[in-house]
């Protein structure tokens, strides 16, 4: 099953990893991104008895576009997918841009979601502007999504063409062009296996078009239409202290306002926490344990 048909006629793409009979956890990718998380399977989630359900958001991968969507609209899609899969209760993980959507689901679906993890998560912008401490390259992308979307679209189209036509050149350029990243992040963009996964992930993100790569940054920069302090379910906040893509200082100031949040700040780590096996294991373990406190699984 690669796609689920929704009541409004749209489809949502998904990939499943780990223990398919295990505790269900929905995974929300970054921006841009796709459901493709692993080249094959995830031995860690399988070992922990977790059924990892990775979804494409509208316009990415196999999911149909949803014009004028909001962050909170995603909760309705997730609820319908869970119903289709006959899953009554579950947890959610949102990474980077996906953190906004995990937070929105936690706010909207407290009767269905047992626990949530915000990993390297973006935070609400003030007056629609990215934080001053954000990496310059990321700030430029947000600026272009609002002011010069045609230029950002051309950039993503060029990237897509490179992946399709000259994958080895893409790998070479990626290795050379990541000097702006923290060293702990650069190490995950070095091997052929890592770069192959990145290419598949990004190719799926732009499978239909590059339009959502421009729309979603703009969406994230606008009002989320809910307040993080109104989230009532257990939340784990995971963040690298050296993260500049989603600046650590921002989540550090917001996390104390989330009533049932536990913070896990990783020393000498950047943005790609889910690529660190020990951290990924801890994220899943904590999420499952906090869910078990809510209801017997």
Task: Specify the residue positions occupied by each region the protein language model found.
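Conserved alpha/beta-hydrolase "acid-adjacent" motif
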Residues: 244-250
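Conserved acidic catalytic loop of the alpha/beta-hydrolase fold
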Residues: 73-91
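Alpha/beta-hydrolase
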Residues: 137, 143-226
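Conserved hydrolase catalytic core segment
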Residues: 88-132
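Short beta-to-alpha linker loops that shape the active-site pocket of alpha/beta-hydrolase fold enzymes
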Residues: 56-61, 66, 122, 269-270
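Conserved HGGG/HGGXW glycine-rich cap/lid loop of the alpha/beta-hydrolase fold
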Residues: 10-62
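Catalytic active-site module of serine/aspartate enzymes centered on a nucleophile-bearing elbow/loop
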Residues: 260-297
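Short beta-strand/loop motif that positions the catalytic acidic residue
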Residues: 231, 237-239, 243
């Amino acid at each position: 099953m690669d796609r689920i048909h929704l009541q409004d006629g749209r489809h949502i793409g998904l990939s499943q990893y780990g223990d398919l009979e295990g505790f269900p956890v929905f995974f929300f990718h970054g921006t841009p991104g796709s459901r493709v998380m692993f080249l094959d399977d995830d031995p860690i989630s399988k070992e922990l008895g977790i059924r990892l359900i990775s979804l494409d958001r509208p316009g990415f991968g196999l999911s149909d576009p949803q014009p004028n969507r909001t962050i909170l609209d995603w909760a309705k899609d997730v609820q319908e997918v869970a119903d289709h899969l006959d899953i009554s209760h579950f947890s959610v993980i949102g990474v980077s841009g996906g953190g906004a959507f995990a937070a929105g689901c936690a706010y909207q679906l407290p009767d269905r979601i047992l626990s949530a993890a915000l990993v390297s998560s973006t935070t609400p912008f003030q007056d629609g502007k990215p934080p001053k401490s954000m990496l310059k390259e990321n700030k430029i992308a947000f600026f272009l999504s609002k002011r010069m979307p045609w230029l950002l679209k051309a950039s993503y189209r060029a990237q897509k063409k490179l992946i399709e036509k000259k994958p080895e050149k893409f790998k070479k350029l990626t290795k050379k062009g990541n000097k702006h990243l923290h060293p702990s992040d650069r190490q995950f963009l070095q091997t052929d296996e890592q770069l192959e996964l990145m290419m598949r992930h990004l190719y799926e993100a732009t499978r239909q078009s590059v339009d959502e790569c421009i729309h979603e940054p703009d969406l994230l920069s606008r009002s989320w239409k809910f307040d993080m302090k109104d989230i009532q379910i257990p939340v784990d906040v995971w963040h690298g202290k050296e993260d500049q893509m989603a600046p650590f200082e921002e989540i550090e100031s917001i996390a104390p306002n989330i009533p049932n949040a536990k913070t896990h700040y990783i020393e000498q780590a950047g943005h790609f926490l889910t690529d660190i096996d020990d951290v990924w294991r801890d994220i899943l373990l904590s999420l499952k344990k906090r869910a078990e406190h809510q209801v017997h699984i």
